[in-house]
Amino acid sequence: MLKGKSLLCLLDFSKQEIEKMMEVSFQMKNFHMLRSVPRSLDGKTVAMLFEKPSTRTRVSFETAIRLLGGNPIVLNKSDIQLSRGEPVEDTARVLGRFVDGIAARVLKHETLELLAKYSNKPTINLLSDLSHPLQALADFMTIKEKFGEYTSLTFVGDGGDNVLVSLMAFVAKMGLEIKIASPKEFKPRDDIMKRIEEEAEKSGAIIEFYEDPYEAVRGSKVVYTDVWVSMGQESIAEKKKELLRNYRVSVDLMRYASKDAIFMHCLPAVRGEEVENEVIDGPKSAVWDQAENRLYTAMSVLSLLL
């Protein structure tokens, strides 16, 4: 069903395909606990290309490849000819002759599209300026573990955030509900928001934007945030921080959520900026379980696509 496909954006997949990714993620977690992981990548090589630094994504993905019996090759941009001006298309053509799949963390989403097109090999988005699909899969895996179902959630912060785009894509495909508390200045790209809205209309999903974080969080079972300033946004850092200063997830804000609410963050966190220490280190925090689940969703996607 999924063999040979690329994972660039969750909007490219059907509800049934996303459900399959989630089902296999839970299976992989069980296999890992039992130390009986199927070696579905035996004899296969995956190139991992990084234009941006990575901790959780690199470690989880490289570990996933090895657990499945595959061979990861890690390529930092500074190590290869891309850093000297080689076109992405040429790099992709060459990698496609050597490896069975490509995974990349890139500055521009268009780079992923070129890698997929010219390598003719399954290509997996490890984060772009547009989206972070593997993160969203791990997030909803965590939510289902905590509540037994995919419950609604509230995102507090930058309304154009790349992780948020993937959360909205998952919600839109699966017919769920998400509230976004954000200054009106921050929204996803018009083209991607149009696709999300079209999918939401088909599935019955509810996606609502609020300017008041307290109103958005009221009664929510999941409160989610991300860093205010992403890599590559340093030139607008101070402006963003000023606009977002009232969108910090605090102990006070969490009081407005459901009594059994959890706090989520894709990490890394800037403590004291988008979240208070007392929240991320508190009893409602699910961030470490969330981070662990990155491994199992990576194993799922690799086994299904390659």
Curated annotation (Swiss-Prot):
Binding site for carbamoyl phosphate: S54, T55, R56, T57, Q81, R105, H132, P133, L134, Q135, C266, L267, R294
InterPro entries in the record: Asp/Orn_carbamoyltranf_P-bd, Asp/Orn_carbamoylTrfase, Asp/Orn_carbamoylTrfase_sf, Asp_carbamoyltransf_Asp/Orn-bd, Orn/put_carbamltrans, OTCase_ArgI
Reaction(s) catalysed (UniProt annotation): carbamoyl phosphate + L-ornithine = L-citrulline + phosphate + H(+)
A GO biological-process term: L-arginine biosynthetic process
GO CC annotations, alphabetized: cytoplasm
Residue positions binding L-ornithine: N162, D226, S230, M231
Protein's name according to its UniProt entry: Ornithine carbamoyltransferase
Organism: Sulfurisphaera tokodaii (strain DSM 16993 / JCM 10545 / NBRC 100140 / 7)
The gene coding this protein: argF
